[in-house]
């Protein structure tokens, strides 16, 4: 098993990694998460071991690479997909455990600047979640720490994670809701009183990027 772990919220991280180790999984992580794991004595590989490319732009680009996304998106029952992986020497990814930068917490601070808010817009994490959700039949998606223990227990007891569990965990409905809700966000936010130009941009970004199991329309209403 190969797992990518990249989390801003480190709750349950050590326990998840230990459980994966017990299943002989190889863990790949971005710099911050890898450092937290290594501090706990847990063996971890950098994501650059998958991509052959370093993290750049002060960490703005870490996981956005075909070697990662092809490994997540490849359907295991489609021979052409497996052939593509083999031809390009890409390893399939079996689990994605990701949660996002604390964007909402940042913009909730009265002293938060627009630049600080922009830096908390998560690009790679959102993309990883969307890719894994699209291929949940083959990839276990973990976005909430409270899901770690039951999933690892199922994996340890049964040797696999069932389709029903994978479907329940994958935020497919949220991905669809956000895509459909973006039009609502863009149309409505420009007419709200009290939202400046920067505030509108940040609010629209939430509609695009927040993945915490709430629909985009609900997010727009909360912002307004």
Q: Which functions belong to the PLM regions below?
A:
Residues 5, 26-31, 45-49, 74, ...:
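General beta-strand structural signal in soluble alpha/beta enzymes
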Residues 90-186:
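Internal alpha/beta core interface subdomains
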Residues 216-223:
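Short, intrinsically disordered C-terminal tails of secreted or membrane-associated proteins
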Residues 1-50:
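N-terminal glycine-/serine-/threonine-rich phosphate-binding loop
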Residues 187, 203-205, 215-216:
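Short linear motifs in low-complexity or flexible loops
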Residues 180-183, 207-211, 222:
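Intrinsic disorder/low-complexity segments
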Residues 32-103:
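Glycine-rich nucleotide/cofactor/substrate-binding loop typically near the N-terminus or early
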């Amino acid at each position: 098993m190969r797992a990518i772990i990249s989390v801003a919220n480190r709750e349950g991280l050590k326990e998840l990694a230990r459980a994966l180790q017990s299943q002989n999984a190889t863990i790949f992580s971005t710099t911050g998460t890898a450092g937290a794991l290594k501090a706990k004595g847990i063996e971890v590989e950098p994501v650059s071991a998958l991509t052959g490319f370093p993290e750049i732009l002060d960490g703005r680009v870490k996981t956005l690479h075909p070697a990662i996304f092809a490994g997540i998106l490849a359907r295991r029952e489609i021979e052409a997909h497996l052939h593509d992986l083999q031809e390009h020497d890409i390893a399939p990814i079996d689990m994605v455990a990701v949660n996002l930068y604390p964007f909402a917490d940042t913009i909730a601070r009265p002293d938060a600047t627009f630049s600080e808010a922009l830096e908390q817009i998560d690009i790679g994490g959102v993309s990883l979640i969307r890719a894994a959700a699209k291929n949940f039949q083959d990839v276990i998606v973990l976005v909430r720490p409270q899901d770690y223990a039951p999933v690892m227990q199922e994996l340890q007891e049964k040797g696999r994670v069932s389709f029903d569990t994978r479907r329940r965990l994958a935020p497919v409905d949220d991905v669809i809701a956000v895509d459909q809700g973006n039009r609502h966000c863009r149309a409505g936010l420009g007419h709200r009183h009290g939202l400046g130009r920067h505030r509108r941009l940040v609010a629209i970004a939430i509609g695009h990027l927040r993945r915490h199991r709430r629909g985009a329309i609900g997010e727009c209403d909360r912002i307004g």
